[in-house]
Amino acid sequence: MKADIHPKYAEVQVTCSCGNTFETRSTLGKPALHVEVCAACHPFYTGKQKIVDTAGRVERFRQKYGNVQRLG
């Protein structure tokens, strides 16, 4: 095997947007990692459905394309 070709494998502190933190090991190269979802708040693991508010996006779409008439 070739020497010194593998990245360093170090401990990383992972912080979720829900506030949950845990340590793992990674080749990331940074001491901290921020994620949006983790096992503590992901709907698959919690059994609760997370509702994503897309009303603003839908309203913008309707304002932009609401006056378009169908062709044909």
From Swiss-Prot:
HAMAP family: Ribosomal_bL31_1. This is Large ribosomal subunit protein bL31. InterPro entries: Ribosomal_bL28/bL31-like_sf (IPR034704), Ribosomal_bL31 (IPR002150), Ribosomal_bL31_A (IPR027491), Ribosomal_bL31_sf (IPR042105). GO terms for biological process: translation. Disulfide bonds: none annotated. Gene3D superfamilies: Ribosomal protein L31 (4.10.830.30). It comes from the Bacteria. Binds the 23S rRNA. It comes from Aromatoleum aromaticum (strain DSM 19018 / LMG 30748 / EbN1). Part of the 50S ribosomal subunit. Its cofactor is Zn(2+). Zn(2+) binds at C16, C18, C38, C41. GO terms for cellular component: ribonucleoprotein complex; ribosome. The lineage of its organism: Bacteria, Pseudomonadati, Pseudomonadota, Betaproteobacteria, Rhodocyclales. Keywords: Metal-binding, Ribonucleoprotein, Ribosomal protein, RNA-binding, rRNA-binding, Zinc.
